Amino acid sequence: MGRSFVYVILGGGVAAGYAALEFANKGIAHGELCIISDEPVAPYERPALSKGFLLPEAPARLPAFHTCAGVNEERLTPKWYEEHGIELILDTRVTSADVRRKTVVTAAGETVSYKFLIIATGARALKLEEFGVSGSDAENVCHLRDLADATRLVDLMQASTGGNAVVIGGGYIGMEVAASLVINKINVTMVFPEPHCIPRLFTPKIASFYEEFYKSKGVNFVKGTVLSSFVINPEGKVTGVNLKDGSYLPADLVVVGIGIRRNTSLFEGQLTLEKGGIKVNSMLQTSNSSVYAVGDVASFPVKAFGEIRRLEHVDAARKSARYAVSAIMEPDTTPEFDYLPFFYSRAFSFSWQFYGENLGEAVYFGDFSGTSFGAYWVHNGHLVGSFLEGGSKEEYEALAKATRLRPAIDDMSDLERQGLRFVVTLSQKQLVLPIVDVGSSTSLVVLEKPEYPWHAAAGVVAAASIAAFAYWYGRRRRRCWMVPFLFPSPRRLWLSNLLFLCSKSSASSLI
């Protein structure tokens, strides 16, 4: 016995919530969509777990951070799903999937069939046992991946005020949790094998700024080594950790943030995997055309890099989820997924954003002794990545636009001198293609201003050529087939629109 839906989302994290909103916006019927999640609550914004949820005063709690609060849209509470006819199958683990038969089976033995499946299973936190260290199940050792983890961590922090915490890992989670521990009046030591924090994005210069600030707040850094064992008392509680370099650290609380592993096991042997995730095409389709993958679990083509990448960040989850719904419901009009890699973090009073990739030579700008500074990365003569701490909304938007353009950089010293002004000026020069109402039953897409100078030149040449040909042909007293398109009547306007849109699409593919 089972149930059948048109659309099934497997997983109940960030991506599931954003996909659900997109389905609702596109007008699916009641009863067509279900979300199957092993968590007991409706989809929520996971970034809150390492930020607002851990605050000692006025902490974030549900329903405040249900999706889609992260982009200031409607919060999708359980009531919202009910009102939109979307079935939430919560606290339910899926034990098997058959993509040929289009079914998934739950731990309770129920079979759920679908027409289209979106895999949004995300990832799980890596455990130290996977590196040969036992003891992660001790009562005061925490990971941070879901609401249950965060709730447990809050309880342990409250019991450890004034005590010692050891944070294993120097990435996003480690840095954000360390800040929260300090705010909760706990002494913090961070341990990681790399030479500096957040090594996947930060240069030594950028990392040094944050590390020095953390040190001023009492955080101790132990770099270049890893945890080798826990010291556990007879009650099953960790009292300290031994490090591979031979040192010992007392601990009332240990938080482990050493990375994630994607939840792909249900589909191994059925779908193509690449780089640790489920491989999808530029429409986010897997090797089975009825199955899509989004968020952390997906390995997708990144046009800016020209290769398949996995991007483990909430922004990619949000945008890929919405895109997949569009690709499923409007496949003929949905362009290829063109995502600009984006990462951000907030801790203490700091807030930074990163776009693109940190490849090539770094060019720094701003005041590294203050609160606003940044960096560009230049590779093969083009700006390919950018970072900014303490920017305004407009400055971050300019950073994103400029990085997507990958402008040529001829003078590195001039780029350094201009600093943030470079991307602000560049973004102001880039103009959009608006849709203009021409007063008929349709709208004509009009190229009001060119995105690039050669676009304008090409447009002028093409227009002049067509006009000259039409004039020459008209002089021969023959009807010019182009005239209806150059001077359309209302009845012919739709065809003019169509031809223009086709040419616009072709041009866009070259940009």
Regions flagged by a language model, labelled:
Residues 148, 152-202:
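Rossmann-like NAD(P)H-binding beta-loop-alpha module
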Residues 1-10, 22, 74-164, 224, ...:
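FAD-binding core/adjacent interface of flavoenzyme oxidoreductases
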Residues 2-5, 297-397, 443-459, 465-470:
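Mid-to-C-terminal Rossmann-like scaffold of FAD/NAD(P)H-dependent oxidoreductases
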Residues 137-161, 237-242, 246-323, 411-425:
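FAD-site-proximal beta/loop scaffold in flavoenzymes
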Residues 2-87, 180-205, 510:
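Beta1-alpha1 glycine-rich phosphate/pyrophosphate-binding loop at the start
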Residues 11-14, 145-146, 169-171:
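Glycine-rich Rossmann-fold phosphate-binding loop(s) that bind the pyrophosphate
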Residues 89-96, 101-104, 112, 182-282:
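A Rossmann-like FAD-binding core segment of flavoenzymes
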Residues 450-481, 492, 498, 502:
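Terminal signal-anchor or tail-anchor transmembrane helices
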